[in-house]
Amino acid sequence: MVTPALQMKKPKQFCRRMGQKKQRPARAGQPHSSSDAAQAPAEQPHSSSDAAQAPCPRERCLGPPTTPGPYRSIYFSSPKGHLTRLGLEFFDQPAVPLARAFLGQVLVRRLPNGTELRGRIVETEAYLGPEDEAAHSRGGRQTPRNRGMFMKPGTLYVYIIYGMYFCMNISSQGDGACVLLRALEPLEGLETMRQLRSTLRKGTASRVLKDRELCSGPSKLCQALAINKSFDQRDLAQDEAVWLERGPLEPSEPAVVAAARVGVGHAGEWARKPLRFYVRGSPWVSVVDRVAEQDTQA
């Protein structure tokens, strides 16, 4: 029979043996000792208000966060470590290569209460400036409304359509050239996005939006991220409320479809040019072009 005194000594002997080369095996009839493992806590076309969510703790919101959200895409590999904020050198390229380069990057929006929303870009459109009959800057036309298109690369150009919806563009290299963001794959803050979308929807506000409906269109993504006219002419490389992070992996060339832009039928031959780019097979894309997909594969 083992006395209580001996029972009390067993843990001390075990603790002293920890860190030595090898533990002595238990004698026959005596159970092996074990330690508890600590577990981590569970955790449209080129042609607004912030969510009332309980604020999360804010330390110092001076720069972009360095950790991605919990959502993992099946169309891109998972992040390996921290994501990097993209600066002027990324945006300073012509509209077409920039529109392609946007695919796979992560757009981040920090709300006033500290909540951060993230979405991976899966669809864009390039607008080439004065020569492009579908661009707001066609013919070199510059107005207070489209001034962001003529500012340095990385400047936001946000305009309103139908008197109530917003579209978000980013200026590129070349006067009057820019890239329209058409669709995102939601990554982080989906419930806040859903709340923002529902607040601004008409008629069907009672229907719960599916994840793939949150950001599948230029105005939808602006609603989901609370992007409005106040963001016009902001610098995406410097702003503290909205920025771009480098995605873990850009889609390979065969995965990128080049198709005609949407809603620019008035632009003659420019309406048919393949200046819209999207990730093949992504359910978050706003408009799928099967003919263009076949041409891309050929």
UniProtKB/Swiss-Prot annotation:
This is DNA-3-methyladenine glycosylase. Coiled coil: none annotated. GO terms for molecular function: alkylbase DNA N-glycosylase activity; damaged DNA binding; DNA binding; DNA N-glycosylase activity. Binding to SSBP1 in mitochondria inhibits glycosylase activity in the context of a single-stranded DNA (ssDNA), but not a double-stranded DNA (dsDNA) substrates. It catalyses: Hydrolysis of alkylated DNA, releasing 3-methyladenine, 3-methylguanine, 7-methylguanine and 7-methyladenine. Residues 1-17 form a transit peptide. Residues 1-65 are annotated as: Disordered. Belongs to the DNA glycosylase MPG family. SUPFAM superfamilies: FMT C-terminal domain-like. It is found in: Cytoplasm; Mitochondrion matrix, Mitochondrion nucleoid; Nucleus. InterPro entries: Formyl_transferase-like_C_sf, MPG, MPG_sf. One of its GO terms (biological process) is DNA alkylation repair. The modification Phosphoserine is found at S78, S252. Residues 9-25 have a biased composition (Basic residues).
